[in-house]
Curated annotation (Swiss-Prot):
Single Gene Ontology BP annotation: lactose catabolic process
Catalytic activity: Hydrolysis of terminal non-reducing beta-D-galactose residues in beta-D-galactosides
Function: Component of a beta-galactosidase.
UniProt-recorded name of the protein: Beta-galactosidase small subunit
Key word Hydrolase present: yes
GO MF term set: beta-galactosidase activity; carbohydrate binding
Family membership: Belongs to the bacterial beta-galactosidase small subunit family.
UniProt EC number: 3.2.1.23
Subunit text: Heterodimer of a large (LacL) and a small subunit (LacM).
The organism's taxonomic lineage, starting at the top: Bacteria, Bacillati, Bacillota, Bacilli, Lactobacillales
Gene: lacM
Keywords for the protein's UniProt record, in alphabetical order: Glycosidase, Hydrolase
Amino acid sequence: MAYTNNLQIIYGDATLGITGKNFHYLFSYERGGLESLNINNKEWLYRVPTPTFWRATTDNDRGNGFNLKASQWLGADMFTKCTKIELKVDDRQFDELPIAPINNQFSNHEYADHVQIAFWYQTLTNPATDVKIIYNIDNTGCINIVMHYFGKKGLPPLPVIGMRFIMPTAATGFDYEGLSGETYPDRMAGAKEGKFHVDGLPVTKYLVPQENGMHMQTKALKITRSSTLNNADQESEFSLKLKQDKQPFNFSCLPYTAEELENATHLEELPLARRTVLVIAGAVRGVGGIDSWGADVEKQYHINPEKDYEFSFNLN
């Protein structure tokens, strides 16, 4: 029997490996997520992707005290607690993870048509709530990612709900299909739909570094890098593509995490750009701007922490 268009499954002691033509994915049970995303021998992950809830506070946020009201989400953004992992290979639902010694029953010639692995996380907030991230991998290597945030009464207001991907090196640029320029829920009126290219990873030069670079209602995104952490690799461009699933997604692509921006009080305090920080967001709080000394963001641009949110996208 030929397995030319199937996934090879490697049941490791603490990981699940999925291999196909020109790709290899590694899911870590210990770290609670996708540990390696290797396509055409190029690694795309520097850290395990995690739920993200924080954006660097803006002048408006500080003026109306939103940073203090939402501060629990900063800790939840920095520290992730994975509570449960669910695995389904083709039609087989595993009652327990196939780690040692259970994985001894499998050979090194295990194949499947599709795999679903779900990671459950508990937020380090009071009260705590749950987030579920599902990875659906088909036999072409395409990964459909679904994130579900479970709302709970009593939680503080949210800055953002999304996933954060940190890549090993800085991107040379990105192309996207969506709205022109930097957009937010309350900053979309002047944007035009189209296809756009951005050189490098630009950061808006505010006097005090803060949230910037969001792109709303995006249909497709291509991130291009030319370097890796392997000194033996010659520089040449390679790309990762993301596409909308059921609905357009929102994204930012910067050289810094929200925490790095938050910690800097002047631009020169930011570190040298070494990584690519991609945030795919299902919900984004508006930035406001009625004034900078007390006016809140208009209510329709808030994220309700008591409401469920779900978004999805495709990656290949």
